[in-house]
């Protein structure tokens, strides 16, 4: 349970308790996440969002009733340990050791393979075939890549949120491997109709939104393409076809969202396995098997401001965290988890 609310004033007048939500975020993250609309909605529920002063020891700040963060480094980890020792009743979202698993693109997706599949679901899920490459010499190892089919997506092994970790390449042929800089992950590119499903998880709440993604690669594209093409996001790959030409063929609105129970199954399984409250995952539908879905990425504390109605969802989450041990436990037991599709 979070620490007690501030004491009532000595005048004897009863005021509703207020709770302090401390946030430790990088400037860019703070600018995108701490919107006036979120601050106002939290305040209307008796919760004040207060920034952590990174220049001062964390353990000496507060009092906080909940701490959310997305900072990294040994010093910050040590500060969290000191804070937890001094304020053991204050929830910290999320534990650094749990976040660490998402910094490696192999361990990140390995957890998906470990999830149980519900017997009553027609749809199935998994991850694309992939291998990790630690050095340039391995790129010439035909045996290592024998199990993969081109084209491939090359992603940096480390996923720490930096610009470098977002730099990816679509590799059409083996010749394109020479431009890559290990360590990296080579993942089979799977045609998915140019649509990606972004699933946001906030405690027990799940929201799925549709976004445009990489265009499918046809045999003609594959034969005429250069060795590799670099890009930073799955939604901005350069292509000779204009957006109107490609997306005129396949409408985002026509894409069918996976069943809510299916999405909730994966989201809940990941939440329990990862031990995280704030994350999202990207999922695609394999066009070769319409009821087969592949999780291709998992991100900690994503850009929630892009999620419809994020202010209400996050405010509810904060409220639950300061009022009971472990947000979402009661929800899952009562089957109150739900998926909002946008």
From Swiss-Prot:
A single BP term in Gene Ontology: inositol trisphosphate metabolic process
Residues engaged in binding 1D-myo-inositol 6-phosphate: 28, 70, 161, 166, 198, 200, 280, 299, 303, 306
Span list, region Catalytic specificity elements (CSE): 219-247
Cofactor: Mg(2+)
GO MF assignments: ATP binding; inositol hexakisphosphate 5-kinase activity; inositol-1,3,4,5-tetrakisphosphate 3-phosphatase activity; inositol-1,3,4,5-tetrakisphosphate 6-kinase activity; inositol-1,3,4-trisphosphate 5-kinase activity; inositol-1,3,4-trisphosphate 6-kinase activity; inositol-3,4,5,6-tetrakisphosphate 1-kinase activity; magnesium ion binding
Effect of residue 211 to A: Strongly reduced InsP6 kinase activity
Binding site for Mg(2+) 1: 282, 297
Keyword entries, A-Z: ATP-binding, Kinase, Magnesium, Metal-binding, Nucleotide-binding, Transferase
Gene deletion effect: Plants display reduced phytic acid content in seeds.
Consequence of changing residue 29 to A: Strongly reduced InsP6 kinase activity
Catalytic activity of the protein: 1D-myo-inositol 3,4,5,6-tetrakisphosphate + ATP = 1D-myo-inositol 1,3,4,5,6-pentakisphosphate + ADP + H(+); 1D-myo-inositol 1,3,4-trisphosphate + ATP = 1D-myo-inositol 1,3,4,5-tetrakisphosphate + ADP + H(+); 1D-myo-inositol 1,3,4-trisphosphate + ATP = 1D-myo-inositol 1,3,4,6-tetrakisphosphate + ADP + H(+); 1D-myo-inositol 1,2,3,4,5-pentakisphosphate + ATP = 3-diphospho-1D-myo-inositol 1,2,4,5-tetrakisphosphate + ADP
EC number of the protein: 2.7.1.134, 2.7.1.159, 2.7.4.21
Binding site for ATP: 105, 155, 166, 187, 190, 213, 296-297, 299
Effect on the protein upon substituting residue 306 to A: Strongly reduced InsP6 kinase activity
Domain spans labelled ATP-grasp: 116-332
Disulfide bonds listed in the record: none
Tissue localization of expression: Expressed in the embryo of 15 day after pollination. Expressed in kernels at earlier stages but at very low levels. Expression in the embryo peaks at 15 days after pollination and then declines. No expression is detected from endosperm and vegetative tissues.
Effect of residue 280 to A: Strongly reduced InsP6 kinase activity
InterPro entries per record: Inositol_tetrakis-P_1-kinase (IPR008656), InsP(3)kin_ATP-grasp (IPR040464), ITPK1_N (IPR041429)
Top-level EC class: transferase
Chain residues that bind Mg(2+) 2: 297, 299
Keyword check for Transmembrane: no
Family in the record: Belongs to the ITPK1 family.
Role played: Kinase that can phosphorylate various inositol polyphosphate such as Ins(3,4,5,6)P4 or Ins(1,3,4)P3 and participates in phytic acid biosynthesis in developing seeds. Phosphorylates Ins(3,4,5,6)P4 at position 1 to form Ins(1,3,4,5,6)P5. This reaction is thought to have regulatory importance, since Ins(3,4,5,6)P4 is an inhibitor of plasma membrane Ca(2+)-activated Cl(-) channels, while Ins(1,3,4,5,6)P5 is not. Also phosphorylates Ins(1,3,4)P3 on O-5 and O-6 to form Ins(1,3,4,6)P4, an essential molecule in the hexakisphosphate (InsP6) pathway.
Protein name per Swiss-Prot or TrEMBL: Inositol-tetrakisphosphate 1-kinase 1
